[in-house]
Amino acid sequence: MFGPPTPRQDAEYTAFVLSASSSLTRTAWLLTGDSDLAAELVQEALVKTYLAWRRVRHGEATAYARRILVNLNIDRWRRRPATPSEELDRAVLNGAEQAVDDRDEVARMLATLPQQQRRVIVLRYYNDLSEADVAGHLGISVGAVKSAASRGLATLRTQYTPVSGGGQ
């Protein structure tokens, strides 16, 4: 069960990476708000997935890698020294200096959420996971997922300002 992967397993892993990399990268970017850090987290998650490839169940590789990605982000956040909200400050400055497209606006809004709410919103609504799957990925109860999603969405609604010129 341990030892180097077989050529067949290498081929399966390569196919997995080709099919899952962009989704994992988008998830990491939404979790971090930083493309360089997102790429670093994805790379580390893919290495850990490769090392465990013999134990990964067929059909669950993306969920396995996503769980590693979320855990790496949690670990990074825990090890980060406490500093004022530099992500929020950076997003506010960027928003004041230039018009942002919808994707950047969503990222800015997500950056203002507490990490737990941000993780729940990204996994639940961006990755379209069920509440039970989100709970499993984050190691929390379904009730905690519902609560974090409700609070996170309420916060996002207060920040959202629709573009004028519509039919209202």
Describe the predicted segments one by one.
Residues Q43-V47, G59-R79, A149:
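Σ70-family region 2.3-2.4 aromatic/basic alpha-helix that recognizes the −10 promoter
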Residues A15, E105-L113:
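Short amphipathic alpha-helical boundary/capping segments
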Residues V120-R124:
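A short pre-motif secondary-structure segment
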Residues V70, L138-P162:
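DNA-recognition helix of helix-turn-helix
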Residues A111, Q115, N127-A144:
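Helix-turn-helix DNA-binding module
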Residues M1-R26, D36-A39, R118:
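A short, charge-rich alpha-helical start-of-domain segment used by transcription regulators
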